């Protein structure tokens, strides 16, 4: 690893790591927790169950201490909506409220700053049954939940409303890996995204109206799309993909409306798939009021895509095994994902392309100059790892170190070019339950033996600990 370029970080730059409630907590039937959409779906359809997952519900103190001991200054985590409100229209669960206070206080005790998401892919089952984000009545339910958390957990100073809007909508209504498992329903996917942007805007307005101390934003998983070559049709396909996956969300967040260019290309995709979405009267006024009140911009980045024009039947193959070459994506009028020679991929077919992160950061600076401070709250790579033989053995995950270092280098390079990015969070703190892959897809800085729940240190954790400060 002697060729690594990142050996130190700016003194004021925040280095953190991340988790999500349903992927780490376990304890899915403990202390009055309600039922979310995954509890039902996984029980009926999956060989993998998220209990005990990483047992964070009981081991949070150990995991937060590990983060602090290895130089991590912040932890992104989420609150389980159905722990706080087992019945989304009912009363708050005191046991859950006390639990999350203990978690946040543990963070502060260890000098680890909590960054907290309200919704991380885990809608209540009752919300799913009533249309999830397609039903605007559920926006009101979300605002009630957000208001309670903003006012209750005053020790939290960094709030995220919704995590990865497009990833959620695409998983539910395009690829079908997430409940309700619909396929290529473009109307539903885009409508859900718009409604989530509206819900986010209303939550931001609520945050400021309540006079809450701290910062608030939402999290977008941004994936740049590059034409596979210089042919005009592939350039246009990459443009449409970018509007669908990135620009639609960025416009809605930072402008509070969708630009003419965004709507033109989005409507091309929708019309080709006999789809549409509705912007109701008053939506854009709310979004415009909220846009300048976002006090941080939060993005996740894992990969970029290389695009070729595609006109035909919609098809997607999802790689759930980690055997390379099993994934594919073809969406009429949007494009086809293709591999570019020389660009490495993970075992799950994700392109490893740090330049895409740099390009996206520069683009945000140039196209949305009004953006607030940026935090990159997920970046990391999955590996297939096995339990070490010795109790104190260190797991060699040099590939992860290389991945993190390459992307962190691009973040620091973007800072040098004037991008106001002040933090980088590694996904993930410990190995976790994966929504669609179960337990063989390991992202953690710390290995979890799921049978005993023992934590083993990986080399990546030691590399992070060894980073110096300028």
Swiss-Prot record:
Claim: ATP-binding is one of the keywords in the record: no
Show the active-site residues. Answer: 164 (proton donor), 378 (nucleophile)
Q: Pfam families this protein is in?
A: Glyco_hydro_1 (PF00232)
> Please, which domain of life does this record's source organism belong to?
Bacteria
Q: Which GO terms describe its cellular component?
A: cytosol
Q: Which InterPro entries would you find in this protein's record?
A: 6P-beta-galactosidase, Glyco_hydro_1, Glycoside_hydrolase_SF
Which controlled-vocabulary keywords does the entry list?
Glycosidase, Hydrolase
- Give the pathway: Carbohydrate metabolism; lactose degradation; D-galactose 6-phosphate and beta-D-glucose from lactose 6-phosphate: step 1/1
Q: EC number(s) for this protein?
A: 3.2.1.85
Q: Which terms does the UniProt entry file under GO BP?
A: carbohydrate catabolic process; lactose catabolic process via tagatose-6-phosphate
Question: Which positions bind D-galactose 6-phosphate?
Answer: 23, 120, 163-164, 300, 434-435, 441, 443
Question: GO molecular function, one example?
Answer: beta-glucosidase activity
Q: Catalyzes what?
A: a 6-phospho-beta-D-galactoside + H2O = D-galactose 6-phosphate + an alcohol
Q: Which PANTHER family match?
A: GLYCOSYL HYDROLASE, LP05116P
- State the family named in the UniProt similarity comment for this chain: Belongs to the glycosyl hydrolase 1 family.
- UniProt-recorded name of the protein: 6-phospho-beta-galactosidase 1
Origin species: Streptococcus pneumoniae (strain ATCC BAA-255 / R6)
């Amino acid at each position: 690893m002697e060729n690594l370029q990142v050996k130190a970080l700016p003194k004021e730059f925040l280095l953190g790591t991340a988790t999500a409630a349903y992927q780490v907590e376990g304890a899915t039937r403990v202390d009055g927790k309600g039922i979310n959409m995954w509890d039902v779906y996984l029980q009926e359809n999956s060989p993998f169950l998220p209990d005990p997952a990483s047992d964070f519900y009981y081991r949070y103190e150990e995991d937060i201490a590990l983060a602090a001991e290895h130089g991590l200054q912040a932890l992104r985590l989420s609150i389980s909506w159905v722990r706080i409100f087992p019945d989304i229209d009912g009363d708050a669960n005191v046991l859950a409220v006390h639990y999350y206070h203990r978690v946040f206080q543990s963070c502060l005790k260890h000098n680890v700053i909590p960054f907290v998401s309200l919704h991380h892919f885990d809608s209540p089952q009752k919300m799913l049954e009533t249309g999830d984000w397609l039903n605007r009545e559920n926006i009101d339910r979300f605002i009630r939940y957000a208001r309670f958390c903003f006012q209750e957990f005053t020790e939290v100073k960094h709030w995220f409303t919704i995590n990865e809007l497009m990833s959620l909508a695409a998983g539910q209504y395009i690829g079908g890996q997430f409940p309700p498992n619909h396929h290529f329903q473009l109307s539903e996917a885009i409508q859900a995204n718009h409604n989530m942007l509206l819900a986010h805007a209303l939550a931001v307005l609520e945050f400021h109206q309540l006079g809450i101390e701290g910062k608030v934003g939402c999290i977008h998983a941004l994936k740049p799309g590059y034409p596979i070559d210089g042919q005009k049709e592939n350039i246009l396909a990459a443009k449409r993909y970018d509007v669908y996956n990135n620009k639609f969300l960025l416009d809605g967040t930072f402008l509070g409306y969708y630009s003419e260019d965004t709507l033109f290309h989005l409507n091309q995709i929708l019309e080709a798939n006999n789809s549409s979405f509705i912007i109701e009267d008053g939506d854009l006024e709310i979004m415009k009021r909220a846009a300048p009140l976002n006090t941080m911009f939060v993005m996740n980045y894992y990969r970029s895509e290389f695009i070729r024009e595609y006109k035909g039947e919609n098809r997607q193959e999802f790689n759930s095994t980690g055997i390379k070459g099993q994934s594919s994506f073809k969406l009429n009028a949007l494009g086809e994902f293709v591999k570019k020679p020389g660009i490495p991929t993970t075992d799950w077919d994700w392109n490893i392309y740090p330049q895409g992160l740099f390009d996206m950061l520069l683009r945000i600076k140039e196209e949305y100059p009004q953006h607030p401070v940026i935090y990159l709250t997920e970046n990391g790579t999955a590996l297939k790892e096995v339990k070490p033989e010795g109790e104190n053995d260190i797991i060699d995950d040099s590939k992860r170190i290389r991945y993190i270092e390459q992307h962190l280098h691009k973040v620091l390079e973007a800072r040098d070019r004037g991008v106001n990015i002040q933090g980088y969070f590694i996904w993930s703190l410990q190995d976790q339950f994966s929504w669609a892959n179960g337990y063989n897809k390991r992202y953690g800085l710390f290995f979890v033996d799921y049978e005993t729940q023992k934590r083993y240190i990986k080399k990546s954790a030691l590399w992070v600990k060894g980073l110096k400060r300028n």
